[in-house]
Amino acid sequence: MSFFEWAVLIWILFAFLPAPLCVGLGMLRIIIAHRRKGNQAVSDKFPEIEILIPIKGILPDQEKILESLLQQDYPNYQVMFLIESQDDPASLLVDGLCTRFPHSRKVITGTAESCGQKNHNLVAGIRCLNRNTEIIMFCDSSNMANADWLNRITAPIRTGAVEAVTTFRAFDPRPETIWGVSQAIYAAFLLLLIVNKPKPWGGATAIARDTFNRLGVIEEWSRNVIDDLTLGNILDRAGIKILMDPRCVLRSPLPSQTLRGFVHYMDRQILFPKWTNPIIWAMTVVFYLDLALAILVTTIIVVMFLFGLVGPFLGWLSCVFLVLVFSVVMLLRQVNPFHIPVRSWLASFLPFIFVTGFVFLRSVFRNYIDWHGTKYWPGKGGVVLSAESADPVLGAGHAD
């Protein structure tokens, strides 16, 4: 075997091994969590919980999504909808829901000046909490929950086992467009990362109110561009363990996702940690671009091998690599609960890899984030340096 062939072998192993290790460990933890279903935390205490839901614009299934959060089997909870302006398209919908569900209310927060609008909304909501609220739940307005979700996810806090819990979401693309399935693939992989290293990242997070106040989260949020990663860093610095329960994953309907919508989603996912968690971002960029390049090169080698243009070692090595890659992709499909057809899942994988690779590469050179109609320029730690109104089309109807 030549030096070049040895080099290719080592490179392929370096590019491939982290993915199956992460996927395998994450799936093992999910399996263990589900087998412990009978041993899950149970509490006969029902302290008051408030769910804070920042909302901007209306998704196609918005009313059904919000109703799922208003119809929880928990005897003592309130829901607070946080809206920037009375003119927001979601305002009338929220008014109707607050009329139908007396345990809900709407808070007009005004426009952010020194932080992300979502952070500004959440800070305003914190300042309007009921006196008796003991647990605060932060939940995105794009997530749908089962009726027993609030009871199950907050049980570890109510028993005193932990001070904070988090969960993620799975995307349900309808129809199964390439870009909707691509987003579901990315979320499946991200879910496994969060299972391995629990951290608030989309979905929902609950925290004991005393803990939240003690950590000074409001001060951090009031100058930062993002809420969940910032909260995760605060918890890490304080040495507070956060529990991730994969049985409480939320559903995010994803109707008719487009390439533009997918790229916009990926921009946020990749760019936020560039400022809040730069080491994680840099490692992810290197790993992902290396994997994307390895998939591209081995695909070319396989085509050349079929035409007799490369030797059998490189040809078969590339074939084995691609088979293993697609095997891992099929394992990821088991993480998504919505039975996306195999053909749609596999057909979306290569477009997902290369478009996401482009977004990762672009993130190296981009110094701003477009989010809900505003363009933010963050600095170290995610602190907002400046902001301006951006594309209004991107400002509404997008999952957080």
List each language-model region with its residue ranges:
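Long helical/loop segments within the catalytic core of UDP-sugar-dependent glycosyltransferases
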Residues: 96-129, 133-134, 152-219, 263, ...
